[in-house]
């Protein structure tokens, strides 16, 4: 698999909107604040034509224009990495117009986004043999202060961090509103490691803190599946979907 070059000091970050753009609040103000942060850190910014658009259905613009923006910004030699402006609903409609064959021949470039951006991240990996980053979209970097996950995401883009880990707490309900676009994540829920079965929920016989490793999870997998119970184990770093007999 091909990996893009890391974002260098004083490098250029490109922004595209293959899904939603940052045309409405709170995303517009959050994205603008994020730009101030990146500029202060010495980065140059290259904004695609759709980043503030909202005329599309479930995406920033027409499928053709969204794909054209992505094609052009991926090919730009003066853009080091790409960050998506947001998630959305219908990025799938741009895929027929994305030139994956040409992208496959291009120098690999990091593209980061989440949710609807899976449409591109998955196909970059499977069709273009190019790695991407499932991570925060551009507007998230406008929060004050940054959550540790945002710091880590930038460290991954710059090559300063090559490992990922979980965080102690997660957000159940966000506090960001049109009136308060820069509030940080509302992390209130403690992370727990659990094993679930399709039939009766949590029933491993172990409390989350007792499951120490993936090997523990695998042992539970073998024990439970041998009893004919398909289930899913949510591990600290990965999801292991188990169906049938191991």
Cite the ranges covered by each PLM segment.
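ATP/NTP phosphate-donor binding region
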Residues: 1-78
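Gly/Ser/Thr-rich loops at beta-strand to alpha-helix junctions
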Residues: 20-23, 86-91, 115-119
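Short amphipathic alpha-helical segments
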Residues: 27-28, 94-97, 124-126
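Long, hydrophobic/aromatic-enriched structural stretches that serve as scaffold segments
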Residues: 75-98
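Structural motif
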Residues: 81-83, 112, 232
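Short, acidic/small-residue loops that bind anionic groups at enzyme active sites
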Residues: 98-123, 131-138
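Conserved anion/nucleotide-ligand pocket segment
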Residues: 132-246
């Amino acid at each position: 698999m091909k990996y893009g070059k890391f974002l260098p000091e004083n490098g250029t970050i490109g922004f595209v909107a293959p899904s939603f753009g940052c045309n409405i609040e709170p995303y517009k103000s959050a994205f603008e604040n994020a730009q101030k942060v990146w500029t202060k850190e010495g980065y140059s910014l290259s904004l695609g034509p759709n980043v503030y658009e909202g005329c599309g259905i479930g995406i920033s613009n027409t499928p053709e224009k969204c794909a054209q923006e992505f094609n052009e910004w991926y090919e730009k030699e003066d853009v080091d990495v790409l960050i998506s402006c947001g998630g959305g609903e219908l990025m799938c409609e741009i895929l027929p117009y994305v030139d994956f064959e040409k992208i496959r021949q291009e120098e690999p470039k990091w593209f980061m986004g989440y949710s609807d951006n899976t449409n591109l991240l998955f196909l970059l990996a499977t069709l273009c043999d190019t790695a991407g980053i499932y991570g925060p979209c551009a507007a998230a970097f406008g929060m004050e202060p940054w959550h540790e996950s945002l710091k880590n995401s930038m460290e991954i883009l710059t090559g300063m961090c090559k490992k990922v880990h979980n965080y102690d707490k997660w957000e159940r309900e966000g506090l960001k509103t049109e009136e308060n676009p820069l509030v940080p994540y509302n992390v209130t829920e403690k992370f727990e490691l659990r094993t679930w079965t399709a039939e009766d929920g949590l029933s491993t016989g172990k409390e989350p803190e007792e499951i120490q490793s993936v090997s523990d999870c695998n042992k539970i997998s073998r024990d439970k599946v041998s009893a004919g119970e398909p289930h899913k184990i949510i591990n600290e770093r990965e999801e292991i979907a188990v169906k049938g007999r191991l």
